[in-house]
Amino acid sequence: MALRPRFWKCLSVCRKLECGFAALSTSSVPAVQPDVESKENEAVAPEFTNRNPRNLELLGVARKERGWATVWPNREFWHRLRVVKTQHHVEAFVEHLNGQVVVSASTREWAIKKHLYSTRNVVACESIGRVLAQRCLEAGINFMVYQPTPWEASSDSIKRLQNAMTESGVMLREPRRIYE
């Protein structure tokens, strides 16, 4: 009960000074903080749960769908590069095994389109390769499969896209799966 009159007295003093709300300390001795126990940080949990969904892929142990050897395109991959060339644009994207598009780049994007003379020529394909490779490396995708059709494989623009991706550090072959 003794604190209430002091509080209102201090508040009334502050109102007169027009300083807003302020609190005054009743003790002149600072509170002493106890030392922190550092032994808690040394304890290691007996079980470790890795929550990275791509961990098994990076180790080469994750399942790949098998039994699609007679079907084209082959479905034995973790990530697949797909290139779509339309009448006016070039689009490349990386597809995961479950069908989701992980990373993409297209000449329809204004950030890429404004630097190109044409959105369909060989230079556009090379630029798309560089941009997609940079985005893949930022996303942590270093390996992927690319299976071009025979008429696409002989194309200069597709060759330049492949060269741009490999020069940027992305391997267009996935490591073999470890069966143990």
Curated annotation (Swiss-Prot):
Gene Ontology terms: biological process: mitochondrial translation; rRNA import into mitochondrion
SUPFAM superfamilies associated with the record: Translational machinery components
Coiled coil: none
Sorted UniProt keywords: Chaperone, Mitochondrion, Ribonucleoprotein, Ribosomal protein, RNA-binding, Transit peptide, Transport
One GO cellular component term: mitochondrial inner membrane
Disulfide bonds: none
Compartmental location: Mitochondrion
Single annotated GO MF: structural constituent of ribosome
Primary location: mitochondrion
Entry similarity comment: Belongs to the universal ribosomal protein uL18 family.
Subunit-structure text: Component of the mitochondrial ribosome large subunit (39S) which comprises a 16S rRNA and about 50 distinct proteins.
Chain's role: Together with thiosulfate sulfurtransferase (TST), acts as a mitochondrial import factor for the cytosolic 5S rRNA. The precursor form shows RNA chaperone activity; is able to fold the 5S rRNA into an import-competent conformation that is recognized by rhodanese (TST). Both the cytoplasmic and mitochondrial forms are able to bind to the helix IV-loop D in the gamma domain of the 5S rRNA.
Protein's recorded name: Large ribosomal subunit protein uL18m
Chain's gene name: Mrpl18
